[in-house]
Regions:
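Catalytic pocket of metal/acid-base enzymes, prominently hydrolases
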Residues: 1-89, 102-146
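Aromatic- and carboxylate-enriched substrate-binding clefts and catalytic-loop regions
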Residues: 176-188
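Divalent metal-coordination and catalytic microenvironments
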Residues: 54, 114, 152, 180, ...
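Active-site beta-loop-alpha junctions enriched in small/polar residues
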Residues: 63, 89-93, 117-122, 152-156, ...
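Active-site-adjacent C-terminal substructures of enzyme catalytic domains
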Residues: 185-235
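Distinct, well-ordered alpha-helical segments
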Residues: 70-75, 96-103, 159-171, 193
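Structural detector of well-ordered beta-strand residues that form the stable sheet scaffold
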Residues: 87, 150, 179-181, 202
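Short acidic/histidine-rich active-site segments
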Residues: 61, 147-157, 203-205, 233-235
Length: 235
């Protein structure tokens, strides 16, 4: 298994059951990519479906977004395959290349723009990945480069580590407001850390509607009050 990833297995046989967690980058390198024509056709169909729902703007939060992905979006926009305005988050490791190229950073074109630098923090494999030291170092470097950081954090340990890293940027005088994505699990201490950090919390009430029963079934009853604490954040 790649670091930070998990291949779920049958409890009796130990054989992989087909569920792969946090393995997007690995799979992207193994699955043949569609041609630009195939991609444009699929994107055009999806774009029209979104238009029919009144959706006029999108944000791609894929953590592996790179210069080449940006160029793909430029081509899709140029060919009118994609009519929505697009904000493209970029992978933290790609920020130096974006800065050197100047791509999207100084543009006032709202049809396609560079957004936050995405950092994945997970506990899918049983331990925090990356570790706390690496999280702090990455957030510090991205903040120094002038990028807003969007930290994917679901488990309480991930939320806590992300909040601590963001809080540090405030003590250093940063004027940027960084993001915590999801914040699915927040016991009282973690909630206090998030509030104190000043982070923008980007959570998904729709997940509760779509998967709330599963969350309750798969989470210990004692932890139910700490799931998706949108009301607690508002207070």
């Amino acid at each position: 298994e790649p670091p930070g990833s998990t291949i779920l297995r049958d409890l009796n046989t130990g054989a992989p059951n087909g569920v792969l967690l946090e393995m997007d980058d690995f799979l992207e390198g193994k699955i043949p990519a569609p041609t630009i024509q195939e991609l444009a056709s699929g994107v055009a169909e999806a774009s029209q479906a979104l238009v029919s729902l009144g959706i006029t703007a999108l944000q791609d939060a894929t953590p592996s977004n790179s210069i080449s992905r940006w160029e793909t979006f430029v081509a899709l926009k140029s060919d009118d395959a994609l009519s929505q305005r697009v904000t493209l988050m970029i992978g933290g490791e790609s920020t130096t290349k974006f800065l050197r190229s100047g791509v999207g950073r100084a543009s006032n074109d709202m049809n396609l723009r560079v957004g936050a630098a995405k950092l994945m923090v997970t506990k899918t494999s049983g331990s925090l990945f990356p570790d706390v030291t690496a999280i702090h170092e990455t957030v510090r470097k991205l903040d120094n480069k002038g990028f807003q950081v969007a930290i994917h954090a679901v488990e309480s340990e991930a939320v806590s580590a992300g909040a601590e890293a963001i809080a540090w940027t405030r003590t250093s005088g940063s004027q940027l407001r960084h993001r915590l994505e999801h914040c699915s699990e927040m016991p009282p201490v973690t909630l206090e850390q998030v509030v104190a950090s000043g982070a923008i919390v980007v959570t998904q009430p729709g997940f509760v509607y779509a998967s709330g029963r599963r969350y309750l079934a798969e989470t210990a009853a004692a932890d139910h009050p700490w799931l998706y604490r949108i009301g607690g954040l508002r207070k």
